[in-house]
Amino acid sequence: MSARPFSTPFDRERRVRSTLKKVFGFDSFKTPLQESATMAVVKGAEDVFVCMPTGAGKSLCYQLPALLASGITIVVSPLIALIQDQVDHLLALKVQVSSLNSKLSVQERKELLSDLERDKPRTKLLYITPEMAASASFQPTLNSLVSRNLLSYLVVDEAHCVSQWGHDFRPDYLRLGALRSRLAHAPCVALTATATPQVQEDVFAALHLKQPVASFKTPCFRANLFYDVQFKELIPDVYGNLRDFCLKALGQKAENGSSSGCGIVYCRTREACEQLAIELSSRGVNAKAYHAGLKASDRTQVQNEWMEEKVPVIVATISFGMGVDKANVRFVAHWNIAKSMAGYYQESGRAGRDGKPSWCRLYYSRNDRDQVSFLIRKELAKLQEKRGNKPSDKATLLAFDALVTFCEEVGCRHAAIAKYFGDAPPACAKGCDYCQNPAAITKKLDALERSSSWSKTCIGPSQGNGFDPELYEGGRRGYGGFSRYDEGSGGSGDEGRDEAHKREWNLFYQKQMSLRKGKEPKIEEFTPPDEDCPLREASSRKIPKLTVKAREHCLRLLEEALISNHQAAGSTHGADLQAKAVELEHETFRNAKMVNLYKASVLKKVAEIHKASKDGQLYDMESGTKSCGAAAEFSEPSDYDIPPTSHVYSLKPKRVGAGFSKGPCSFQTATELLGKSHSQKQAPEAMLEGGQEPPGWVCDLQDEDRSKPHPGYQEKALGSSVNCGDPSPEKKTKGSSQGSAKARASKKQQLLATAARKDSQNITRFLCQRTESPPLPASVPRSEDASPSCGDVPGKCTQEVGAQGHLVAVFQTEGPRERPSTCSLRDQSFPEGQPSPLKETQAEKRPRPQQGNPERRAQKRLRPSTKSSILAEAKDSTLASDRSTENKVAQEPCQLSASGTSLREAADIVVRHLTPFYKEGRFISKDLFKGFARHLSHLLAQQLSPGRSVKEEAQSLIKQFFHNRARCESEADWHSLRGPQR
């Protein structure tokens, strides 16, 4: 859809001028070129390219035609801040304009999309970013507008971002070429303020502008801007110089104390912004810093104060200014050199948009030049490592060299800028420091050449005879080198000069050595502690360079923190806080090996104490001791606690008794043993009533060593003695038999552990209902091959499993086998209502709410399945199934299945196999590489072909994609790629 049809050219011009006056409030256009560009866009017969300086009125060239058109104009802009500034300006003019970006709320986004779905949308201009234009969420809206023929124009603002030869290249702008191809019926308008001939050609090619293109370009010369360069090396007080410049540019203050304008000072780093704002404020210029390190609210407040002219000067990084439209900026100063001529021209062009005289100053320093040059080359090196060398890489260096030439060479500043952008030399009329006083600039450059910082650029003699006192032995020419022997005959005069030179050098050497002798570092002597020093091991010199005074200071910090903690917690009982502080300090001293580690540990403890005080809790000395890594005794674990990793000696089964000490034997009565076993029985029953199974059911699934903990851990957990002889018959109850079996290392225990591992892989053990049963009598022997899991509750569990059909025999007769891989457990399915053992192990310590009736859950677990089950298989088939599972795990460990593939796993595999193609340059940009990897990962996560892994499918799809395609140039390339079908 083009612009609204007009009967005659006169009618078109009349409507344009009427809208210009009625909506924008202008009687006429700012320049004839602006009027010509606007009329060309309104006509809609060809694509338009507009290149005008900042403040020349580029936005009006597309905003006015958009209001006259009957459809919607899509405007692509690089920054949300710039978009918001344009939207606010148009809303103030009562223009129906909207922005679709990530900062919209859900309600605002819903209202905007519903308006775009109308037959006649109210929105006239829709601002989006290039990322939004390429996003999948925007495509349905775009397709709807295209299908209904509701698009009037496609506008690309800041079009120089599309060129790799430009100073602000953005890869997302390259995707706009595909968008332009889809909207071939709508005229395209490209606008920029800085465009060299090379950049202009790139814009035409990348945006697929139809030839011939109506090009409107204004010369870059702005007569109201005065350019000058100041050399930091030649200024005694550079901060004072900047203050004088600010006050002169701002002019006289009004009666209320406010200035008639404002100014911007650009710095390269955040630290420089903060420092410069402080220096200017201390010298009488109200200035505030603005950079990305500030909070969003602080940045907004500083910007608003500057816009309202409460703060006349803002010191900012280069990120500030693109989204700000302020006409009365009287000066722009660059504290450091910019990265390119185009960037400097764009930033300095933010001054004087109202057409009044304004000043642009650059503070130049050789040190800044070297730093920026190093950063540019470093960035190029990183890019070249990823994508190789490109011809556009030279453009970055050439753009920076052009700005260096602008500062260092003698000549008109405006002429240097015009030469860079391909314009004819303008009539400066004393609009720069050189044209105003050429002799002064020439004198400054000569002084700069003679300054110390510039003499280092070339190693040469500073004296007539070639001797340079700053170089070793006067330098090559001063020393003479091989030239002495080339002369054939050295006279007595040469020998005399050599002798004098040698004496001078000896005197210089002796003088330097005498100076160095006085600067030898003094060895610090250790100051012994006082007699009343409260520190433990105060005279110890375990930590080098740690003084007693420093330890006493740390002790006071700990003591003060403990006192404040007792006060905050409201503790009433008296405690020797100094003794506690001494203990904490000594513990930290004993564990640290360096001074900085010691101080860091003390500060960490102080922070922990303050945190406890803030929470109103009394600081626990024992917990603090454990947290800092000191040796502490392990507390007695309960039956539901999994031993920590430090208690498990190895993941492999070990022969108990070969290297572990049994510990001292202590006497314990039978009454204590029976009471302890009774308390251990009640805990699993309470857990069953609360809707959670004891972790003992599933410990064997995770690790076979869980059934056989460390001997030292067993002794503390059981709390019973270990006799060297055989246990008495009275102790063979349900609780004591298990404890005695775990307490001694024998072949019987190894067989029990093997059976437990084998039993843990069988699904039928999860169908058993755990019920309380009386302890076995002493006369009933316990089967040596029984599983510990079933042996704990030998009553109803054994009977129910036996009723399913000779499964008990399987448990008792199967021989030991290798432990299956953990990955095979993930693929096992569990009965309905029964949680996965792995998940149960992870969540066994987490409290759960009550989940219904336990009897009803038991019925759900015992519900028969309509599919074939392991319960109906015979013994041989069960063993065969187990062997096949082991073989599969041994051949393909941890291989992803089709049903269990997650998006993250698929993404890792896709990126791993797609990266070589990216390094070969098969993707035009990194964003395309990310987009294709995301698309392929979603395809693989949704479905897989039967019998194929994620790796195989990924390789197949990548090979299919690059079969007839040399490079991936747009997202449209993979739209036809389909995922695997089942």
From Swiss-Prot:
Binds a Zn(2+) ion per subunit. Residues 491-621 are annotated as: Interaction with POLR2A. A motif (DEAH box) lies at residues 157-160. The modification Phosphoserine is found at S489, S492, S728. It is found in: Nucleus, Nucleoplasm. InterPro entries: DEAD/DEAH_box_helicase_dom (IPR011545), DNA/RNA_helicase_DEAH_CS (IPR002464), DNA_helicase_ATP-dep_RecQ (IPR004589), Helicase_ATP-bd (IPR014001), Helicase_C-like (IPR001650), P-loop_NTPase (IPR027417), RECQ5 (IPR010716), RecQ_Zn-bd (IPR032284). Residues 241-398 form the Helicase C-terminal domain. The modification Phosphothreonine is found at T527. Zn(2+) binds at C412, C428, C432, C435. Its cofactor is Zn(2+). One of its GO terms (cellular component) is nucleus. Monomer. Interacts with TOP2A, TOP3A and TOP3B. Interacts with RNA polymerase II subunit POLR2A. Identified in a complex with the RNA polymerase II core bound to DNA. Interacts with RAD51. Interacts with WRN; this interaction stimulates WRN helicase activity on DNA fork duplexes. Interacts with MUS1; this interaction promotes MUS81-dependent mitotic DNA synthesis. NCBIfam families: recQ_fam. DNA helicase that plays an important role in DNA replication, transcription and repair. Binds to the RNA polymerase II subunit POLR2A during transcription elongation and suppresses transcription-associated genomic instability. Also associates with POLR1A and enforces the stability of ribosomal DNA arrays. Plays an important role in mitotic chromosome separation after cross-over events and cell cycle progress. Mechanistically, removes RAD51 filaments protecting stalled replication forks at common fragile sites and stimulates MUS81-EME1 endonuclease leading to mitotic DNA synthesis. Belongs to the helicase family. RecQ subfamily. This is ATP-dependent DNA helicase Q5. It comes from Mus musculus. The lineage of its organism: Eukaryota, Metazoa, Chordata, Craniata, Vertebrata.
